[in-house]
Amino acid sequence: MATVTTQASAAIFGPCGLKSRFLGGSSGKLNRGVAFRPVGCSPSASFKVEAKKGEWLPGLASPGYLTGSLPGDNGFDPLGLAEDPENLRWFVQAELVNGRWAMLGVAGMLLPEVFTSIGIINVPKWYAAGKEEYFASSSTLFVIEFILSHYVEIRRWQDIKNPGSVNQDPIFKQYSLPAGEVGYPGGIFNPLNFAPTLEAKEKEIANGRLAMLAFLGFIIQHNVTGKGPFDNLLQHISDPWHNTIVQTLGGN
């Protein structure tokens, strides 16, 4: 729950001029100081407001087990899923990985549709990609993907339970990942050498959450209209007053 500290002096309500000063926040937390100092009056007159923790709903207390120390922690857990510390560790990593997959998925759904529409490439839309002929059947590809993903997820779970235990490549012994924080392996997985700062983590988790919502929106949009997001955008732009969600849901 946000903490608001107020220090005021009756002198600020006097007939003196007002001077304001704003201090910006950082590291995902808002720290704002607002000082009103009367011109020619005592320098002790001040008014300070400080918010130290974000809330997903203003005025609603955050659960005690969500302290605001995690990236993207705004106290949102209405079902109490993260009350168990072991569950919280897993959910943190699960959200991080699902957010990364969602960002890749949304880009993989949207960009080919855009590039095909403007004539740069010619590939099937994402919702028709499963009907294409590949080097193996869809069921075979699914089994292969399941086995590979299963192996990766087991390794990831081992790293969550015992950080750093899977940094060594089990096949190519000459390769290993540097020691680091769980979920941010670095090395070959960080070719641009981005530092895992709190600000970067906040941005990644926020973009990952947006991507998960966008992915769900693309699926629902296609089930309703039979088209992808870019085609729907072009249709809306062609007649903004009539090609809207209202007309679509109304069946017009």
From Swiss-Prot:
Cofactor note: Binds at least 14 chlorophylls (8 Chl-a and 6 Chl-b) and carotenoids such as lutein and neoxanthin.
Native source species: Pisum sativum (Garden pea)
Binding site for chlorophyll b 2: 100, 143
Residues that coordinate or bind chlorophyll a 4: 207
Induction (free text): Down-regulated by UV-B.
One Pfam family it belongs to: Chloroa_b-bind
UniProt GO cellular component terms: chloroplast thylakoid membrane; photosystem I; photosystem II
Entry binding sites for chlorophyll b 3: 137, 153
GO biological process: photosynthesis, light harvesting
Residues bound to chlorophyll a 3: 204
Subunit structure: The LHC complex consists of chlorophyll a-b binding proteins.
Protein's name in the database: Chlorophyll a-b binding protein P4, chloroplastic
UniProt note: domains: The N-terminus of the protein extends into the stroma where it is involved with adhesion of granal membranes and post-translational modifications; both are believed to mediate the distribution of excitation energy between photosystems I and II.
Family classification: Belongs to the light-harvesting chlorophyll a/b-binding (LHC) protein family.
PTM characteristics: Photoregulated by reversible phosphorylation of its threonine residues.
Segments passing through the bilayer: 101-121, 134-154
Residue numbers binding chlorophyll a 5: 203, 221
Residues that, per the record, bind chlorophyll b 4: 156
